Every structure is written in C-alpha cells, then in structure tokens.
C-alpha cells in the first residue's frame, strides 16, 4: 500500500514573494504527501544548488520551472512504482540520477520537495504522524523531545533593511516547562519589545523572519532593548530567558577583516571579533552564537572555539551547510560545537538525518532551522521532535510562515504529552 503511483511538481510562492518548488507524492490507497522547499538569503557557498530559471522576463529570473520540470519528468519517472517507505532508497535514486555533487542538475529545491513529500506520504500510509515516522527513519522509534525555540525578535543583516550588522538577536525561553509555555513567553516578550522600541521612537516594522528591524546605535543596543523587554514582560534574563545571536559574519567579512557598520565601520581581525563577541557574552547572558566568523575562516574558528567553546554553544551554519563531509572535518579539527540543520542546504531528508546523527555522536548539538524564505510547510517542527534534536530556530512571533511551525509544535506536544519532554537549558551546549 505504499507504492508510489504519481508525483506532481508545481511552482508556488514563498514568504518573500519568490517562486519555490512544491511537490506531491501519491501512493496506492489514496495516500498523499505534499511539501515545499524553503529558500535562504544569506547562503553558504558550499550549499547544494537551488535551481532558478534565470529568465529575467519571469519573476525577475527567479522562476523554478526547470526544477518543477525535473520533478514532473525524470524524478517522477524514476520513483513511480517504488516503495515510499524506503526513504533512503528514494533519496538515493534522485541523487544518483542528478549525478552532481551539489544537485545542480535537478536542483536541491526539486529533490528536497519530493524527498519530504515522500516521507509525508509514507507516514500517512503507515497511519502515523510525520514526527513518528521520522523517529523510525532516524533509528530512534518512540524517542521524542520538544525543542527549545530560538526566537529571532530583532532582525538585521541580510534579513532586514537597517543598519544592524548581526543578522539575528534571539531569545530562548529556557525556564519554560513546555513548548506551549515557551511560545507564550516569547510572544509576551515580543509584544513588550514593540512597546520598548516605540517608546524610543523606533520603527516596529518586521524583517523576513518576523522580528523587528529598527535602526539602532550599535549591535549591543539590540541586546539592551531586548533585556528591557524581557524585564517588562516580568521575566528574569539569564534564568527564564537566555539570549542567542546569529552573526552571519560572512556577510560583513571584507578583505580578511570583519567590518561592522553599526560600530562606525570599525574593522576587526578574527581574534578581535571573537573578543568583541566575548565582551558581549560578559555583559548579557548570551548562550549561543552562530556563524561568529566567515565560513572560510577555519583558523579563526579554531581560536574562537578555544576562547568560547567551553562556555557557550558555537553553531556552524554557513560553516557546515548541513554537509556530513564538512561537519566531519570540523569535528576532527575541533571547530565549533553545534551545527545548524537546514535541509535545503543538503537537499534530502536522508542526508539531513545523517548530519544530525553525526553531530550528536560527536557530542555536538543540532539546531533545526527554517530559512528566511519560507512557506506554510511546517515539516521542520516534525523533524525537530522526531529526531529529539532539542532546539529549533523558526523566526519570531509574527508572520504566518513562521507561526505555522510554532503552532505545529503546540499540536505535537498536545498529542505526545509526557512522551516528549521540554528540557529547556539542558539542550543547549555548555548549559547543562
């Protein structure tokens, strides 16, 4: 009953108004899975390729009809008749047929959409929720946890049109007893932050991920206004709520220096920027820093890991691009201590699960993440619970493309109850 009978690809629109690929996988017995590929703004150079048409007369060149054509053509022909429950087999067929290292033939957006739709169809045929099916694919049946959210409430960098260099300033409601309570705490801080910003005469328009995007005097001022909002919401910073940052440092790395517009165009060496971040962690309870240096600055990362790695979580995003080959090298060289997991960086569910497993086996944490270009697809919520990853990054408390994932987590927690504990601070590297 889990034989694939039909595969459909289509072009839909993401949260930035750009096209993306949606796929449907139909099985015998009428079971259907549907999924859409997300899309990033600040991307690592070694990510799997997102195939765009390049036809400037359509969607400013961002159309995905070639990728959709791959879904409806060669991919469909290759997997119709196969067993959807064999996720690794389905993914391997698509990857082998594409034949390139970075999935540039069909596009990672085509392969991923089909990979996720296939998993959803297989889960439906087994009569189980997606998170339960993912736990089985992961070799950890029945093992679940609810992730601690990293809520991006101030957006800068490539996600906003402001003068803030650091791309994301996040809160983590570590003192909550459930994901539902964590989401409530995040929502309350988010609304108090609007009041704080308005009180200072600042803009409360939101960026790509639903966080506010004000012009601030410095990067540290973003932390200061968040601290004010946490207090106004009645929470204790450092106890109830901790802070996290995504520097996306590759975006302000120029000619071997880190140039910060928000600090008066000051240029830092790798070591100086690491100490700039270290100073911030002394002023505020920052427990996680992502991409604290450029993706190619491995010597700098080794130094940063030496200085900060035993105190806080250092997450590699552009650094590792959800790629087991690169992650393996990072583990061997002692670079960072956590990986950001974005399944469109690698392009299939099977490879995503392999990256999570490799990280956990090495004592690294794995943070499941959205992209800045999203849809209503909430698969990452199921992925976080089904792999018991422990942390999720899916934006702020506004925009339906972000909130869809939080709402799915609320539903899953309700269904699983005590089978899926919310472990709070213990999930974050260096905070147990």
Swiss-Prot record:
Keyword Lyase: yes
Compartment(s) of residence: Cytoplasm; Secreted; Cell surface
GO CC list: cell surface; extracellular region; phosphopyruvate hydratase complex
SMART domains, A to Z: Enolase_C (SM01192), Enolase_N (SM01193)
One term of GO molecular function: phosphopyruvate hydratase activity
InterPro entries to which the protein is assigned, alphabetical: Enolase, Enolase-like_C_sf, Enolase-like_N, Enolase_C, Enolase_CS, Enolase_N
Binding site for Mg(2+): 246, 290, 317
Binding site for (2R)-2-phosphoglycerate: 167, 342, 371-372, 393
Pathway the protein takes part in: Carbohydrate degradation; glycolysis; pyruvate from D-glyceraldehyde 3-phosphate: step 4/5
Catalytic activity, EC: 4.2.1.11
Record key words, sorted: Cytoplasm, Glycolysis, Lyase, Magnesium, Metal-binding, Secreted
Family the UniProt entry places it in: Belongs to the enolase family.
Name this polypeptide is given: Enolase
Organism of this sequence: Cronobacter sakazakii (strain ATCC BAA-894) (Enterobacter sakazakii)
Name of the gene encoding the protein in the UniProt record: eno
């Amino acid at each position: 009953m889990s034989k694939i009978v039909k595969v459909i690809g289509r072009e839909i629109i993401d949260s930035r108004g750009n096209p993306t690929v949606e796929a449907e996988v139909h099985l015998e017995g009428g079971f259907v899975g549907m999924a859409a590929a997300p899309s990033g703004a600040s991307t690592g150079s070694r990510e799997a390729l997102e195939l765009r048409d390049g036809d400037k007369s359509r969607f400013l060149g961002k159309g995905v009809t070639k990728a959709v054509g791959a879904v409806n053509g060669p991919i469909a022909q290759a997997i119709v008749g196969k067993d959807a429950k064999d996720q690794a087999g389905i993914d391997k067929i698509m990857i082998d047929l594409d034949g390139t290292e970075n999935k540039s033939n069909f596009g990672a957006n085509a392969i991923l959409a089909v990979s996720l739709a296939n998993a959803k169809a297989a889960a439906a045929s087994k009569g189980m929720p997606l998170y339960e099916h993912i736990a089985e694919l992961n070799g950890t049946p029945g093992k679940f946890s609810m992730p601690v959210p990293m809520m991006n409430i101030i957006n800068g960098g490539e996600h906003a049109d402001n003068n803030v260099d650091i791309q994301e300033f996040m809160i983590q409601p570590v003192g909550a007893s459930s994901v539902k309570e964590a989401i409530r705490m995040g929502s309350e801080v988010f609304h108090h932050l609007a009041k704080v910003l308005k009180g200072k005469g600042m803009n409360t328009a939101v960026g790509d991920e639903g966080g506010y995007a004000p012009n601030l005097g410095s990067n540290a001022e973003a932390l200061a206004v968040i601290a004010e909002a946490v207090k106004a919401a009645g929470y204790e910073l450092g106890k109830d709520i901790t802070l996290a940052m995504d520097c996306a440092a590759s975006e302000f790395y120029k000619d071997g220096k880190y140039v910060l517009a928000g600090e008066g165009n000051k240029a830092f060496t790798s070591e100086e920027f690491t100490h700039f971040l270290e100073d911030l962690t002394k002023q505020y309870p920052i427990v996680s820093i992502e991409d604290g240096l450029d993706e190619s600055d491995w010597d700098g990362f080794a130094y940063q890991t030496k200085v900060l790695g035993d105190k806080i979580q250092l997450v590699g995003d552009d650094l590792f691009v959800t790629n087991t080959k690169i992650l393996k090298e990072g583990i061997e060289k002692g670079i960072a201590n956590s990986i950001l997991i974005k399944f469109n960086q690698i392009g299939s569910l099977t490879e995503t699960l392999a990256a999570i497993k490799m990280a956990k086996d090495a004592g690294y944490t794995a943070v499941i993440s959205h992209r800045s270009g999203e849809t209503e697809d909430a698969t990452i919520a199921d992925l976080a619970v089904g792999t018991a990853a422990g942390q999720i990054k899916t934006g702020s408390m506004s925009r339906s493309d972000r909130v869809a994932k939080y709402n799915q987590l609320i539903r899953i927690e309700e269904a699983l109850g005590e089978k899926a504990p919310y472990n709070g601070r213990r999930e974050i590297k260096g905070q147990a």
